[in-house]
Structures are given as C-alpha cells and as structure tokens.
C-alpha cells in the first residue's frame, strides 16, 4: 500500500483562480483517475466530485492545481514521499494509512460493495458463503486491512485468495470476462458502474468507511483545508455537490 509505483507521470495544470506562473500558489496533486464519480477521465479531461470540492478550496485561496495521475499505490506513495502535497480519488481514512499520512476531516460517508454480474445471480445472505468465490480489487485499497483484520480471523476469507489489479478498470474487465466472481468496489464507484454495466450488489458493508483528502505527515495545507471545510464551505453546499455527482 505504501510502495511507490507510479503508473503515469503526466502532469496537468488545472487553473483555479490564479496564474500558473506563481509557483508559491501551486499545489501538487496525486490522483487515480479511475474512481468515478470521485475522480475519473471524461472526454480527455480529469473530472469528479473530489476535484470539484478541492477546486472550491483553491478558488477561495487563489491557487493552482498541478495534477499527476498514478495507479492507486503510486498515488498514496507520492503523498508519503512528499512528491505530492495532497491526494484525492475517493481515499478511505484508515488507521493503517494514518500511520503514514495525514487526512482532512471526512467529507463524505461511503459503503463497500461486493459486486457481481447480473447473470451470475450471486446473493450473499451470510458472509460464511464468501470463501467459495474469488474477489478482486485494486492494489493498495483499504479492503486488504478489512479482510486481514476482520474477515480472516473469523475464517470468512483469506487475503491470499484475493486477486489484485492496477485499477478498477482491470477489475471490472476481469469480472465481465468471467475470470472473477466478485469485485470489491467503493459504493460511489459501484453506483456509477451499475448504470453502464450488467452488475449488481451481492453484499454491502455499511457504517465504517469515510473519504478524506490525504496529505504528507505534518502538512500545514491539511490544517487550512480543514478550516475551509469546517468554516467556509456550507454543509448544504457540500451535500449538494455530493448529490450532483452521485445522481
């Protein structure tokens, strides 16, 4: 999860209210643009809930975002190594991650969904049924800690059974090709792909996952982002933004 394995090193400048010539106001952002609706590519542009939310902060501060795309592990590694000032792409706040990086206050709640193809008709009424199926998800996701710390001790599922991929794109491709039974997806990601792919929720984990912006340890930027989220961004405006991207 902390290994630095950058997949793409192409930097894009996203203007948010000031000139890119002012280097002091440039914020280096690490993303994984394969996590809709939080962060993804559309018509050659990087878009998403997380980006629009952080652009609101940037507009208030008069700064510029310099965005670099990575695979999931590379994104987190860029924050840990301080190659990036912040990372966002629907990143779950976990105790394990907080040992290596700092997080903003949570900006939204999330679910974790086990998704299958409609024609497989996989419905898990009891997690004891899980071990008969293959599960896949991107490397570096918080699901690994959940399986290791919660499911494995109970004999429900073993981490060495999991298939790991670079991003959700490869996970869903293998699911559709019949090489995978269940894809572990963030609830926000699942809500998008249910509209375009023949998939359904087979099981949903609720009540313990929250998204936040990730920062290097000791980041002063984190403090200012928290001040913006707490004192300047109205709760109703934040919820309207979330509803817009989840609709």
Please place each PLM-identified region on the residue numbering:
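C-terminal motif of bacterial Sec signal peptides marking the signal peptidase cleavage site
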Residues: 14-17
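Sec-dependent signal peptide recognition
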Residues: 2-9
């Amino acid at each position: 999860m902390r290994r630095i394995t950058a997949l793409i090193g192409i930097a894009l400048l996203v203007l948010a209210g000031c000139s890119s010539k002012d280097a002091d106001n440039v914020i280096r952002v690490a993303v994984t643009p394969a996590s809709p609706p939080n962060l993804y590519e559309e018509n050659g542009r990087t878009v998403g809930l997380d980006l629009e939310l952080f652009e609101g902060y940037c507009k208030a501060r008069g700064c510029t975002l310099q965005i670099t795309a990575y695979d999931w592990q590379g994104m987190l590694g860029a924050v840990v190594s301080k190659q990036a000032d912040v990372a966002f792409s629907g990143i779950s706040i976990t105790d394990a991650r907080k040992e290596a990086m700092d997080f903003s206050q949570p900006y939204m709640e999330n679910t974790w969904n086990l998704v299958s193809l409609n024609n497989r008709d996989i419905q898990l009424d009891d997690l004891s049924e899980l071990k008969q199926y293959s599960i896949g998800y991107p490397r570096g996701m918080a699901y690994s800690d959940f399986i290791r710390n919660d499911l494995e001790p109970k004999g429900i599922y073993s981490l060495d059974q999991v298939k790991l991929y670079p991003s959700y794109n490869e996970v869903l491709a293998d699911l559709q090709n019949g090489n995978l039974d269940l894809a572990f997806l963030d609830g926000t990601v699942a809500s998008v792909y249910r509209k375009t792919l023949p998939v359904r929720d087979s099981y949903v984990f609720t009540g313990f996952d929250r998204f936040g912006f990730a920062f290097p340890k000791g980041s002063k930027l984190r403090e200012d982002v928290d001040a913006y989220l707490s004192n300047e961004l109205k709760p109703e405006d934040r919820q309207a933004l979330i509803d817009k991207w989840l609709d």
